[in-house]
Amino acid sequence: MVLPNFKENLEKYAKLLVANGINVQPGHTLALSIDVEQRELAHLIVKEAYALGAHEVIVQWTDDVINREKFLHAPMERLDNVPEYKIAEMNYLLENKASRLGVRSSDPGALNGVDADKLSASAKAMGLSMKPMRIATQSNKVSWTVAAAAGLEWAKKVFPNAASDEEAVDLLWDQIFKTCRVYEEDPVKAWEDHAAILKSKADMLNKEQFSALHYTAPGTDLTLGLPKNHVWESAGAINAQGEGFLPNMPTEEVFTAPDFRRADGYVTSTKPLSYNGNIIEGIKVTFKDGQIVDITAEKGDQVMKDLVFENAGARALGECALVPDPSPISQSGITFFNTLFDENASNHLAIGAAYATSVVGGAEMSEEELEVAGLNRSDVHVDFMIGSNQMDIDGIREDGTRVPLFRNGDWAH
């Protein structure tokens, strides 16, 4: 199989990411994080960014093999410290209000078998050191977009029955192009129309200002409180300079932050989670008074326990997102082993930090003010998928009345 018009569609994709995703403006600095395997796409993105007037494009190359070797052989004292040059680079990007485009294509199991203590220590150190960047991103001080590219090992995981490596990669690119609307006659208008539909759902939820959400499904009975003056967001966002951008491509969600002090019940994951180079399956979480009191996983149990119990703020939730089961990604029937795609096929929750923009005026609040408002503060943010065609969700008003939001995995109205 050879994907028809691949080069033409890759160019369209690069333009969509730069012009509509990040929305590069004259004078911008752009930081591009991308795997060495995606050199062709990186070149197209860099060319397009400069064509739109970017003053500087900084490419931060990643490599699964090199990363794995580091974790296998580097001593702990190197892994639990972040080098000064990385912190200096972060500060440079912040000073220049750099937009951030992350193109994900990693092997979901790249770090299988690596010492969990090493992974946990490194993730914790990076989370603490990169906190200023995380805060800038989660409060939309700068534009940021997360997208994907078809990496070989990832493609083989998603399409294990493909006739060849080339076919697996082509099949994955085909899904990326479909879900990002690259095949549409006018991809820009297709995104505008899609964003308008999602915004209408967010507007309805913002008008209601529910006090809580109640989720029920096999293995799930969970009530999440919502903060006062919470904000449901959808496809588009606005940075501190008043410029629009798309945080995720693709996206099918509307999302907000729960009140981290008000979660009670239990929930079971419905899709695998790829986290820190490990694939985690069968996650079960129990909450009491907002805190995770028990968490298990059929596969990757220790990785999940380390995530929750070794990171500050990781015992509470920072995001709840609504995605109808009939979404195009869900209906593809494909498990992508990649959160960007799998979260857009399913209702999901996030362990850890909330986005500051999830309450009115949050982008201008201090960390302490956000916490008082009910938004969880943490150095991690990890989504896991809980939705299915058997999930019902009710919105609960202040007076206790219930409004059906989801029935059998889809919007009730």
Model-identified regions with their sequence ranges:
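A short secondary-structure junction signal
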Residues: 112-115, 155-160, 236-237, 278-281, ...
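Short linear motifs in exposed loops
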Residues: 225, 295-296, 406
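Active-site lining segments that contact anionic ligands and/or coordinate catalytic metals
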Residues: 262-264, 280-282, 289-292, 315-319, ...
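Extended hydrophobic packing segments that form well-structured cores
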Residues: 368-413
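Long, well-ordered mid-to-C-terminal structural blocks that present hydrophobic/aromatic surfaces
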Residues: 256-310
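Active-site bordering "gate/hinge" segments
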Residues: 1-264, 395, 401-403, 411-413
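Dual-mode signal for accessory low-complexity, basic/Gly-rich regions
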Residues: 294-363
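Short solvent-exposed loop/turn micro-motifs enriched in small/polar/acidic residues
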Residues: 15, 206-208, 276-279, 313, ...
